[in-house]
């Protein structure tokens, strides 16, 4: 079970360099034993929870008194996650106020649904969704940089290079939305926030719409958004498309470069505003703007949506990509997914081993971007860990042994310091300690020499004494081994090298990901149905007799159950008729596998029903078929005439082999009463001539259930 809210609390804040007594100094080390995260990351000081001003607690969140924003039916407040100690933004929607607006009531949960469909570094991350009787809560990441509009008010206007950076991030986020089929419809300066790294974060998907993905009818026919940022086709109440977001980006770009809006009318009138947009009567631009910026801005504010560029064309603009060194966004099938390699192993291990969550639940929730408490814990812990690593001068302080192993990709030092630490380890004092170990321990120690240890060790080691020749040989072998490890494809330490588990080790045989909880996350290949041609039946040679071969199966065209089919979807071409060869005489049945012994396509072999259950007369047919006889068409046809020289048998008699092969007319009781009777062969040809030679065994009884399953009872 997941840990309680107070399980991860520390008595004192684990701030770097903080003073305290002997008991306080021992607490971080105790928290680090057997842990996968630093104590500063995994623990929450009690003072942080006590000093946070709040008026309510909902789930694992404290709803703070500080208000970040307010709308007609919703308020955004600062919150605190009690399990991680991280601050979040909580949007509280009042259901009573929302009921007054039919549009809001109908689409109350749409914002949360849309935000779970997307994941982008310039879009706020939705962490959790909670609902009570009176309120609906959306928990999102907090952007401490504030609103971009406040920054424009302070500076009056932004420089062209800074505005270009913001506009490119905004276009990248909108392009990601459009690839996911989402149109924002309310892009304005007030909905652009800044994070701690001064990057754009797009918020407020309350008016966003999804192009038919979420099942909403007529998605592009409503009047929405602020009129100053709305495209002309929106003001004219015409049908519109994703290019309305391109127009809004142009308005935001004009506001960043000038500090004002491009189209304004006094007094305000929608008709006059629309006419000014159509006539391209834009307010004057600053003279210091470059030609490329002006040309790009005018293309975004094109009133004709046909001539206006789409979001992909805008992202490829030359002025926008000038001096840009970032990565080009790649087209992905699922815009809300991340790859397995992007997960933080330390955070996943902490959640599974310390907080008690299942490994498969954590991985599946994070990869699928499903807003719940698991995603919130992972995101906040990972963000806290990144902030801890970036703020530490020496990342090895307060880190435990396992953390260095599982975070080797992030904790790996540069090459220069890496080689320097290796040379330090080759000095006499440390090598004397290595030589005292056993050979196996010495080999393991040599494999782990590449880790950059703490600075305290460097002060105690001598700096001038040279190692002996045997020690130099060990150094060279160690360096060669480390180079091989660097060249390997795996970015995490192997289990055999460090004696630890790798939760993201892919097995080549089963194509699965082995987790630390002995569970397996399947990574199946694409399931593409393919037609498998049925092999042609064996044609007897000119010298062969009518007696079938020993190895010929007694059951032909067997219907396989779902349990006997492999992972690939096979579409088998079966013959029109299915004849099941079943003998009621004391003979032995050839050993078959489970798929051949199963007559029922729905139940596995060996499943039995009570014998008194009546058997459906059309499910199972009993036939002795001659291999040399021509194939017969299946249908409601009359039985072939019986030869005149043979004894006549009634049509429904169990001794009439041919009539039983087509129309079994007796019930389960008759078959059970006749099961000990011997079959009367026809006079023209003995029955033994059409059967393969079989070894005599003990008599067997056949029991039939309603699902056509056959089970031998000795």
UniProtKB/Swiss-Prot annotation:
ATP binds at residues 68-76, 91. Pfam families: Pkinase. Residues 437-461 have a biased composition (Basic and acidic residues). One of its GO terms (biological process) is signal transduction. Belongs to the protein kinase superfamily. CAMK Ser/Thr protein kinase family. SNF1 subfamily. Residues 1-15, 599-611 have a biased composition (Low complexity). Keywords: ATP-binding, Kinase, Nucleotide-binding, Serine/threonine-protein kinase, Transferase. It catalyses: L-seryl-[protein] + ATP = O-phospho-L-seryl-[protein] + ADP + H(+); L-threonyl-[protein] + ATP = O-phospho-L-threonyl-[protein] + ADP + H(+). GO terms for cellular component: cytoplasm. The gene is HUNK. The keyword Nucleotide-binding applies. It comes from Homo sapiens (Human). Residues 62-320 form the Protein kinase domain. GO terms for molecular function: ATP binding; protein serine kinase activity; protein serine/threonine kinase activity. Its EC number is 2.7.11.1. It is an enzyme of class 2 (transferase). This is Hormonally up-regulated neu tumor-associated kinase. PROSITE patterns: PROTEIN_KINASE_ATP (PS00107), PROTEIN_KINASE_DOM (PS50011), PROTEIN_KINASE_ST (PS00108). Residues 1-26, 437-471, 518-552, 590-615 are annotated as: Disordered. The active site is at residue 186. Gene3D superfamilies: Transferase(Phosphotransferase) domain 1 (1.10.510.10).
């Amino acid at each position: 079970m997941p840990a309680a809210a107070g399980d991860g609390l520390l008595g004192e804040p684990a701030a770097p360099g903080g003073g305290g007594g002997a008991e306080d100094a021992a607490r971080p080390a105790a928290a680090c034993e057997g842990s996968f995260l630093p104590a500063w990351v995994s623990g929450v000081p009690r003072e942080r929870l006590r000093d946070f001003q709040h008026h309510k607690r909902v789930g694992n969140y404290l709803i703070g008194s500080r208000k970040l924003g307010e709308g007609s039916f919703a308020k955004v407040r600062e919150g605190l996650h009690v399990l991680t100690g991280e601050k979040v933004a909580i949007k509280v929607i009042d259901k009573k106020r929302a009921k007054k607006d039919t549009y809001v009531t109908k689409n109350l949960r749409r914002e949360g649904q849309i935000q779970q469909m997307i994941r982008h570094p310039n879009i706020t991350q939705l962490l959790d969704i909670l609902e009570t009787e009176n309120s609906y809560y959306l928990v999102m990441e907090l952007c401490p940089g504030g609103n971009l509009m406040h920054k424009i008010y302070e500076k009056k206007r932004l420089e062209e290079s800074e505005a270009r950076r913001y506009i490119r991030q905004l276009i990248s986020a909108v392009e990601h939305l459009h690839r996911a089929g989402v149109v924002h419809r309310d892009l304005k300066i007030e909905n652009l926030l800044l994070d701690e790294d001064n990057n754009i974060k797009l918020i407020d998907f309350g008016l966003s719409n999804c192009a038919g993905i979420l099942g909403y009818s007529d998605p592009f026919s409503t009047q929405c958004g602020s009129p100053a940022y709305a495209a002309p086709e929106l003001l004219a109440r015409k049908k519109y498309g994703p290019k309305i977001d391109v127009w809004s980006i142009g308005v935001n770009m004009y506001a960043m470069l000038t500090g004002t809006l491009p189209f304004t009318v006094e007094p305000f009138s929608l008709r006059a505003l629309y006419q000014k947009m159509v006539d391209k009567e834009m307010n004057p631009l600053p003279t210091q703007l470059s030609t490329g910026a002006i040309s790009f801005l005018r293309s975004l504010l094109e009133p004709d949506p046909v001539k206006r560029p789409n979001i992909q064309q805008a992202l490829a603009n030359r002025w926008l990509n000038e001096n840009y060194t970032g990565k080009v966004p790649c087209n992905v099938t699922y815009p809300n997914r991340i790859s397995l390699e992007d997960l933080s192993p330390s955070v996943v291990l902490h959640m599974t081993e310390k907080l008690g969550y299942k490994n498969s639940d954590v991985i599946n929730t994070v990869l699928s971007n499903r807003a719940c408490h698991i995603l919130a814990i992972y995101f906040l812990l990972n963000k806290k860990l990144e902030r801890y690593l970036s703020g530490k001068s020496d990342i090895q302080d307060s880190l435990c042994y396992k953390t260095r192993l599982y975070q080797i990709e992030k904790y790996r030092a540069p090459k220069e310091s890496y080689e320097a630490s290796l040379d330090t380890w080759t000095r006499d004092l440390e090598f004397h300690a290595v030589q005292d170990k056993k050979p196996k321990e010495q080999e393991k120690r040599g494999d782990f020499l590449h880790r950059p240890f703490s600075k305290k060790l460097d002060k105690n080691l001598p700096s001038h004494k040279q190692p002996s020749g045997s020690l130099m040989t060990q150094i060279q072998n160690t360096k060669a081994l480390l180079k091989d490890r660097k060249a390997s494809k795996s970015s995490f330490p192997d289990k055999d090298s460090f004696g630890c588990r790798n939760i993201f080790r892919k097995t080549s045989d089963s194509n699965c990901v082995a987790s630390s909880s002995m569970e397996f996350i399947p990574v199946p290949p694409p399931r593409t149905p393919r037609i498998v041609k049925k092999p042609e039946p064996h044609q007897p040679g000119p010298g062969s007799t009518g007696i079938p071969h020993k190895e010929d199966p007694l059951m032909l065209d067997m219907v396989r159950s779902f349990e006997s089919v492999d992972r690939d979807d096979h579409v088998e071409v079966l013959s029109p008729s299915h004849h099941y060869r079943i003998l009621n005489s004391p003979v032995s049945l050839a050993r078959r596998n489970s798929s051949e012994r199963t007559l029922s396509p729905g139940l596995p072999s060996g499943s039995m029903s009570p014998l008194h259950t009546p058997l459906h007369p059309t499910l199972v047919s009993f036939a002795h078929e001659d291999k040399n006889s021509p194939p017969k068409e299946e249908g409601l046809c009359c039985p072939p005439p019986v030869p005149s020289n043979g004894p006549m048998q009634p049509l429904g008699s169990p001794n009439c082999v041919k009539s039983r092969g087509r129309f079994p007319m007796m019930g389960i009781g008759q078959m059970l009463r006749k099961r000990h009777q011997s079959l009367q062969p026809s006079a023209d040809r003995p029955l033994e001539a059409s059967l393969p030679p079989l070894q005599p065994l003990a008599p067997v009884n056949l029991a039939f259930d309603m699902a056509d399953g056959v089970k031998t009872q000795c």
